[in-house]
């Protein structure tokens, strides 16, 4: 605000009392209520201080608006000039007012390494910025290409292959992750590829309407090989653990005639036909003179199971098969030959009798049948516990449909 001195012309003069009142009101308007300091007021004194002229021009309104803006917090980085207490107008006080500086826009930062991204090409996942080299699969540590999908789960970045290994269900037979477009067969809670739903022994494909069974290990067996699996499973459950030891011959009689001979050690009781003893002499001959030196073999569960399973496939194995079976069961080749010979004799005797003899190995439970369900049907329908159904899992399941929080580049 600028003030001008009055001229000598009496026509331009005004009343002194009125001018002082207007000047006081102006100073009160220009006083800052918070700091109580006069801001940007310039007064030029004259040799004749008795009379003043006040200019109500547009400059006053502009400067008044400027003072109002200066009181706002965003306009504080200005230098205010106020007159000193003395009458000398040349002595001015400069005061710097602190304000926040206007900074340029922050550069994009990588959310992993927190460094600025200055590359021409960046990766954006879920609205966050990353370096192309920083965005990697956390299992195989391979950076993502532009055509690859990036799966994000629990804050972990995974490629398609590692995500399938970690979260997708796999085929029970080939252990390959199941894709959404794959046709699958479901037996109880186990899922198979359509091509993997075959018999474990002969490899024949199981079709709708065929009879099959499933072992506790998840192996499928057709109706032709059901008997081998039936005897193997029940032998494992019903057989009693036997001591796989060779009974030593009785000790020689004492030399003295006065003392009574010691009692012979008790022989372990012979089991039923499930124990499958190999009654052979030590030298391979069945002569009665050496019957006292005959060694009797008792088989373990896994040995008996392996021999019965192989007997269901081949009743008369050759030398090569016996060698492999001996390495698997830890038995001698001679013991295996005798066991297969006795098993063949028993099998022919049962066929000659006109039917299988009643034994605790028979299974009274019916075989399970399987049905083919429509592609989108659920497997939770009520059916017998013995029935294994073949169907395709619903495509709307979370196993085969992509999750909502998965994001790709």
Curated annotation (Swiss-Prot):
PANTHER family: LIM/HOMEOBOX PROTEIN LHX, PROTEIN APTEROUS. One of its GO terms (cellular component) is perikaryon. The keyword Transcription applies. PROSITE patterns: HOMEOBOX_1 (PS00027), HOMEOBOX_2 (PS50071), LIM_DOMAIN_1 (PS00478), LIM_DOMAIN_2 (PS50023). Expressed in the AIA, AIN and AIY interneurons, and in the NSM neurons. Expressed also in ADL and ASI sensory neurons in 60-70% of L2 larvae. Expression is also detected in head muscles of embryos and some early larvae but not late larvae or adults. Residues 108-169, 171-232 form the LIM zinc-binding domain. InterPro entries: HD, Homeobox_CS, Homeodomain-like_sf, LIM_Homeobox_TF, Znf_LIM. Keywords: Cell projection, DNA-binding, Homeobox, LIM domain, Metal-binding, Nucleus, Repeat, Transcription, Transcription regulation, Zinc. Changing residue 340 to I: In mg158; thermotaxis defects with animals displaying cryophilic behavior. It is found in: Nucleus; Perikaryon; Cell projection, Axon. Residues 292-351 bind DNA. Residues 245-299, 372-409 are annotated as: Disordered. CDD domains: homeodomain, LIM. GO terms for biological process: associative learning; axonogenesis; dauer larval development; negative adaptation of signaling pathway; neuron differentiation; olfactory learning; positive regulation of dauer larval development; positive regulation of DNA-templated transcription. Disruption phenotype: Animals are cryophilic and move toward lower temperatures irrespective of cultivation temperature in contrast to wild-type animals which move toward their cultivation temperature when placed on a temperature gradient. AIA and AIY interneurons display defective neurite morphology. NSM neurons display loss of or reduced expression of a number of terminal identity markers including cat-4, flp-4, bas-1, ptps-1 and mgl-1. Reduced expression of ceh-23, kal-1, C36B7.7, ser-2, unc-17 and sra-11 is observed in AIY interneurons. Preexposure to odorants fails to leave an olfactory imprint. Transcription factor. Binds to a sequence motif, 5'-TTATTGGCTTCGTTAA-3', which may be involved in AIY interneuron function, in the regulatory elements of target genes; binding is more efficient, in vitro, together with homeobox protein ceh-10. Required for specification of the AIA and AIY interneurons and the NSM neurons. Positively regulates the expression of a number of genes including ceh-10, ceh-23, kal-1, hen-1, ser-2, unc-17 and sra-11 in AIY neurons, and cat-4, flp-4, bas-1, ptps-1 and mgl-1 in NSM neurons. Its main location: nucleus. It comes from the Eukaryota. It holds the Pfam family Homeodomain. SUPFAM superfamilies: Glucocorticoid receptor-like (DNA-binding domain), Homeodomain-like. It comes from Caenorhabditis elegans. This is LIM/homeobox protein ttx-3. One of its GO terms (molecular function) is RNA polymerase II transcription regulatory region sequence-specific DNA binding. Residues 382-409 have a biased composition (Polar residues). The lineage of its organism: Eukaryota, Metazoa, Ecdysozoa, Nematoda, Chromadorea.
């Amino acid at each position: 605000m600028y003030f001008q001195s009055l001229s000598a012309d009496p026509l331009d003069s005004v009343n002194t009392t009125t001018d002082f009142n207007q000047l006081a009101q102006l100073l009160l308007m220009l006083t800052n209520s918070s700091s109580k300091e006069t801001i940007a007021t310039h007064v030029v004194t004259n040799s004749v201080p008795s009379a003043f002229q006040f200019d109500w021009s547009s400059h006053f309104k502009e400067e008044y608006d400027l003072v109002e803006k200066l009181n706002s917090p965003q306009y504080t980085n200005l230098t205010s000039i106020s007159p000193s207490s003395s009458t000398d107008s040349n002595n001015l006080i400069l005061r710097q007012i602190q304000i926040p500086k206007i900074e340029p826009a922050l550069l994009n930062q990588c959310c992993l390494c927190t460094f600025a991204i200055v590359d021409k090409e960046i990766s954006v996942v879920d609205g966050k910025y990353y370096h192309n080299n920083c965005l990697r699969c956390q299992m195989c540590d391979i950076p993502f290409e532009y055509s690859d999908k990036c799966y994000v789960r629990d804050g972990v970045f995974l490629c398609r292959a590692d995500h399938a290994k970690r979260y997708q269900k796999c085929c029970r037979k080939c252990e390959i992750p199941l894709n959404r477009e794959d046709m699958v067969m479901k037996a109880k809670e186990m899922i198979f590829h359509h091509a993997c739903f075959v018999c474990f022994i002969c490899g024949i494909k199981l079709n709708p309407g065929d009879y099959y069974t499933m072992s506790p290990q998840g192996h499928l067996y057709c109706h032709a090989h059901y008997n081998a699996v039936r005897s193997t499973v029940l032998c494992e459950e019903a057989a009693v653990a036997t001591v796989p030891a060779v009974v030593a011959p009785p000790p020689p009689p004492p030399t003295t005639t006065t003392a009574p001979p010691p009692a012979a050690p008790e022989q372990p009781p012979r089991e039923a036909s499930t124990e499958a003893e190999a009654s052979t002499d030590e030298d391979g001959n069945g002569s009665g003179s050496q019957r006292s030196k005959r060694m009797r073999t008792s088989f373990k569960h896994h040995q008996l199971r392996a021999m019965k399973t192989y007997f269901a496939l081949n009743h008369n194995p050759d030398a090569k098969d016996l060698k492999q079976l001996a390495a698997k069961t830890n038995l001698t080749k001679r013991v295996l030959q005798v066991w297969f010979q006795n098993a063949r004799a028993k099998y022919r005797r049962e066929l000659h009798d006109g039917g299988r003899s009643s034994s605790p190995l028979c299974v009274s439970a019916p075989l399970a049948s399987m049905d083919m369900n429509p592609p989108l049907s659920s497997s939770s329908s009520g059916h017998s516990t013995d029935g294994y159904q073949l169907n395709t899992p619903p495509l709307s399941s979370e196993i085969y449909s992509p999750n909502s929080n998965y994001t790709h580049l």
